[in-house]
Amino acid sequence: MLAKRIIPCLDVRDGQVVKGVQFRNHEIIGDIVPLAKRYAEEGADELVFYDITASSDGRVVDKSWVSRVAEVIDIPFCVAGGIKSLEDAAKILSFGADKISINSPALADPTLITRLADRFGVQCIVVGIDTWYDAETGKYHVNQYTGDESRTRVTQWETLDWVEEVQKRGAGEIVLNMMNQDGVCNGYDLKQLKKVREVCHVPLIASGGAGTMEHFLEAFRDADVDGALAASVFHKQIINIGELKAYLATQGVEIRIC
């Protein structure tokens, strides 16, 4: 059995790490490189960086910090933000990123997933899905351009359909960003994760809602996700990664202990 992964998420805007609640009202957390170094030293299995306004601003991720991160950490990291072409992806990977993630650009042009997978291999192509639960209809809908509140829009895709579509097109991993739970710290949406797990046959990463160590355990044990991504609990030092992994190990979760 492959070890489950603990993945800190660093949302980047204007060269700094920020964090919002339900993708809104972002506050500055700190500088990118020192935070990345700290998480690697604490025992993170991987890092994910989102340049959150790159797609809505119509630009590729600001690359100046990518190579600096690669110099100070020895764990894999993934970069997302406005990657719309093979050339964009090649530049990010050449600066030291191990994976690239696409979200809004994939919705705008689904063929991009296949072209990236064919060029670089499915193992380094991640598709991020920003999903919102509509309580009135009971449905999960995919959102686009979520880095900019004024441009965020609901797409025609229901979440489960898009999960199946991106796999057909070559996604090697899916990060499910559950917008209703984002930054609220009251737990992952296990009901949604279980539904997605049934149709997701590539590694699935849960994102949005972690507030306690038990929330991570529930995602691994009850929804069988491959990794759990979180931001607020790590940024605010509510949970220490090393202590979290020790706890998960005592609960029978296969996890890499540093």
Curated annotation (Swiss-Prot):
Chief place where the protein resides: cytoplasm
Q: Which Gene Ontology CC terms are recorded?
A: cytoplasm
* Pfam families in alphabetical order: His_biosynth
Compartment(s): Cytoplasm
Catalytic activity, EC:
4.3.2.10
Among the GO biological process terms of this entry, one is: L-histidine biosynthetic process
Pathway(s) annotated for this protein in UniProt: Amino-acid biosynthesis; L-histidine biosynthesis; L-histidine from 5-phospho-alpha-D-ribose 1-diphosphate: step 5/9
Bridged cysteine pairs (disulfide): none
Q: Annotated Gene Ontology MF terms?
A: imidazoleglycerol-phosphate synthase activity; lyase activity
Look up keyword Cytoplasm and say if it applies.
Answer: yes
Could you identify this protein by its name? Imidazole glycerol phosphate synthase subunit HisF
Q: What lineage does the source organism belong to?
A: Bacteria, Pseudomonadati, Pseudomonadota, Gammaproteobacteria, Enterobacterales
